[in-house]
Amino acid sequence: IGIFFNFFINWITNVKNKFARKVLEFFTGIDKRAILPKYNKETFANYFQKFKKNILPKHKERKVVIYSTCFVNFNKKKTGEAALKVLHHNNVEVEHSYAGCCGMPYLEQADLDQVTKQAELVSRELIKYVEKGYKVVTLTASCGLMLKFEWPLLMPNDGIIKKLSQNTLDIDEYVMDIANKEGLVDGLKEIDGGVTVHNACHARAQNMGNKARDMLKLIPNIKLDVVERCAGHGGT
C-alpha cells in the first residue's frame, strides 16, 4: 500500500505537514516530531528484476543472494541499487529474495511467537539459495543480526536456521572479504568532501569488527569520521 500510494503517504507523514502529523499523532500515537521513512516509487524487488534483464550473463565464481529487508525493499531502494552495482561490478553473481520481514520489530515487542513464524517463513526461502552455494548478504544491520544470532538463539534445534546463520554476511563484511581475498576490481576514485559512517549497535553486536569503516578506507585519500553512539533504535 505504501508503495502504491507513496506520494500521498509521503506527503501526510512529512514533518512539515503539521496538520496531518497532529492528526496522525492523535490516532496512532506517533510523535509529530518523528521523521518517518519515505516510501519508494517501486520496490527493490521490482528494480532487481529489471536490472537482471539488462545485464550480460558471465561466469562468476562468487554467488550471493541479497536479502533486501523491509527497509531497503520499501523505503531505501537506493541502498539496494548501490549494493547490487558494486557486487556486479566485482564479478559476483547476484540473486534477490524477500519473503518477508526478519521479525526484528516483533522481537522488540517481545512477540516471540511471531518472530518464530517470520524466521521460518524467510529461512525456508533463503536456504534454497544456500544449498546451491550462495551466500546470503544483508543490507540492514538489524536484519543481519536477526539472521546470524537472534534466530539461532530462539530456534537452536532448527538445522535450517543454523545453516543459514553460518552463511549470512553483512554487505560491508562481504565486500571486505572480496577485498582481502581476490581484491576489488580496479577503479576506486577519490570522492569530494569527507564521509561520516555510523557504526550501529546492531552491527557491533555481530562481532565482525567495523567493516563499514574498513571498506570506506579503501577509497583513495578518504576523509573518514566514525560515529559510535547509539542512534536510538531501541527507543522506537
Residue ranges of model-derived segments:
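Iron-sulfur cluster-binding electron-transfer modules in prokaryotic oxidoreductases
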Residues: 1-236
